[in-house]
Regions:
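A diffuse structural propensity rather than consistent per-protein peaks
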Residues: 6, 12, 27-30, 206
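Active-site mouth loops of central-metabolism enzymes
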Residues: 1-11, 40-46
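Beta/alpha (TIM)-barrel catalytic core signal, keyed to glycine-rich beta->alpha loops juxtaposed to Asp/Glu
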Residues: 27, 34-220, 232-246
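Conserved PLP cofactor-binding pocket of PLP-dependent enzymes
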Residues: 228
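A glycine-rich helix->loop->beta "capping" turn
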Residues: 20-26
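Short, acidic/polar
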Residues: 6-20, 74-82
Length: 246
């Protein structure tokens, strides 16, 4: 099993990545889920980002093997703690940076911007929840909270009114945030890639439309209790996983 505290294993992972990429140097090396120690126990001390992984990153940076050190995580507040250590150049924040899920704006984005870090917005379509209009599913999903259901209704009414497809609206919303450097998209087909490119080419959203989206987002400012991390629209739902040990 992978040991995130083993310097030799970390170096081996890096060299394997270089070999697979056909490169001797990597522009950005990111620590995956640095904010969830029950998934990857990277740190000897999280508050100052101290652990073997940083020793390896500092060494690789000094050797010119990597240009930038990054964080890639999904929490809205622990990530900010790591950002404030000043040891990183780039942050990828996912699942808290989209039309309706905006917790990254409370601490992650401001902390990264203050330090001049590159900010990558991951999962702008919220793992498919914003990839299309799920009108029937929103009305029938037993796991969806009443406030979130009403929020989706308002969003879909706005989509119908302005005539902008929901994926395009989602991308152009993020394009309207000047502190975000990169929008990280997943695409399953050439058509989806073309659609993303076309949406970006239309540029940021106008201020009046952004204001209306802000009003809709404010209806549910924080994720409701027990809301599935990835909304299972169109998929079987087996309930919320049990909480693990603290």
């Amino acid at each position: 099993p992978f040991n995130p505290r083993d310097p030799a294993a970390l170096l081996e992972s890096f060299e394997t990545s270089c070999k697979l990429l056909g490169r001797d140097q990597i522009d950005i090396l990111m620590i995956h889920e640095p904010d969830r120690p029950r998934q990857f126990d990277w740190w000897e001390a999280m508050d100052d980002a101290r652990g073997p992984v940083m020793d390896v990153i500092d060494r690789l940076k000094g050797e010119g093997r990597i240009r930038f050190a990054g964080l890639g995580g999904t929490t809205a507040y622990d990530m900010a703690r790591l950002i404030r250590t000043g040891r990183f150049d780039v942050v990828l924040t996912a699942f808290n940076t989209s039309l309706l899920w905006r917790e990254a704006w409370h601490e992650v984005i401001p902390a990264a911007a203050e330090r001049g870090m590159g900010i990558v917005a991951g999962s702008p379509l919220q793992q498919g929840a914003l990839a299309r209009v799920w009108r029937e599913e929103v009305e029938t999903a037993t796991w969806l909270s009443k406030p979130r259901r009403e929020q989706f209704r308002k969003l879909y009414a706005l989509v119908d009114e302005v005539g902008i497809p929901l994926p395009e609206l989602s991308l152009r919303f993020l394009l309207s945030e000047p502190r975000i450097s990169t929008i990280l998209m997943g695409a399953r087909s050439v058509a989806e890639v073309d659609g993303n490119v076309d949406a970006i080419a239309r540029g940021p959203l106008p201020a009046d439309l952004l204001a209306r989206l802000d009003e809709i987002a404010a209806m549910v400012p924080f994720r409701p209790h027990d809301e599935p991390f990835a909304l299972p629209f169109g998929r079987a739902y087996a309930g919320t996983p049990a909480a693990g040990p603290v």
